[in-house]
Amino acid sequence: MRIGIGIDIHQLVEGRKLIIGGVEIPYEKGLKGHSDADVLLHAISDALLGAAALGDIGKHFPDTDPAYKGIDSQLLLKHVRKLLETHGYKPVNVDSMLLLEKPKIAPHVQKMRENIAACLEVDVDAISVKATTNEKIGYVGRGEGALAHAVCLIEKI
């Protein structure tokens, strides 16, 4: 078994959809990025890649490649799962934490868990998504961005 950790951050801006955990969340701002900027799925992807010592999402999905412009990060996470498989690993579980001042994430957590589980081909009980605010401290607390942390466990197939 191997453990991985991932972190991602994206700026909140007007004129973008807010997509977290593969869920489009109604809000006046969205996350800025080359892809759909799904901060949670990016952190999870990095955790999985790191656990298998396969680099990070920037290596596999560079923001200079037009093929990834606006791409659904669920497709990226599915590709990460396939990469793990080709290297003899499969995901066991994921624990993640999202820091975001607004909007409230709780109503969307179950769907996020289901999306992540489907991408990784694991049971939804193997996926944890938690969210908290930053108590109005720092860039997250001022509503300027969102931050996600993820820890995963993978095992040999």
UniProtKB/Swiss-Prot annotation:
InterPro entries associated with the record: MECDP_synthase, MECDP_synthase_CS, MECDP_synthase_sf
GO function term, MF aspect, one: metal ion binding
EC number in record: 4.6.1.12
Site (described: Transition state stabilizer): H34, T133
Keywords linked to the UniProt accession: Isoprene biosynthesis, Lyase, Metal-binding
Cofactor annotation remark: Binds 1 divalent metal cation per subunit.
The reaction(s) this protein catalyses: 4-CDP-2-C-methyl-D-erythritol 2-phosphate = 2-C-methyl-D-erythritol 2,4-cyclic diphosphate + CMP
UniProt binding sites for a divalent metal cation: D8, H10, H42
Domain of life: Bacteria
Gene3D superfamilies: 2-C-methyl-D-erythritol 2,4-cyclodiphosphate synthase
Pfam families: YgbB
Cofactor: a divalent metal cation
Pathways involved: Isoprenoid biosynthesis; isopentenyl diphosphate biosynthesis via DXP pathway; isopentenyl diphosphate from 1-deoxy-D-xylulose 5-phosphate: step 4/6
UniProt binding sites for 4-CDP-2-C-methyl-D-erythritol 2-phosphate: 8-10, 34-35, 56-58, 61-65, 132-135, 142
One GO BP: terpenoid biosynthetic process
Lyase as UniProt keyword: yes
Entry function: Involved in the biosynthesis of isopentenyl diphosphate (IPP) and dimethylallyl diphosphate (DMAPP), two major building blocks of isoprenoid compounds. Catalyzes the conversion of 4-diphosphocytidyl-2-C-methyl-D-erythritol 2-phosphate (CDP-ME2P) to 2-C-methyl-D-erythritol 2,4-cyclodiphosphate (ME-CPP) with a corresponding release of cytidine 5-monophosphate (CMP).
The family this protein is said to belong to: Belongs to the IspF family.
Quaternary context: Homotrimer.
Name by which UniProt lists this protein: 2-C-methyl-D-erythritol 2,4-cyclodiphosphate synthase
Organism the protein comes from: Chloroherpeton thalassium (strain ATCC 35110 / GB-78)
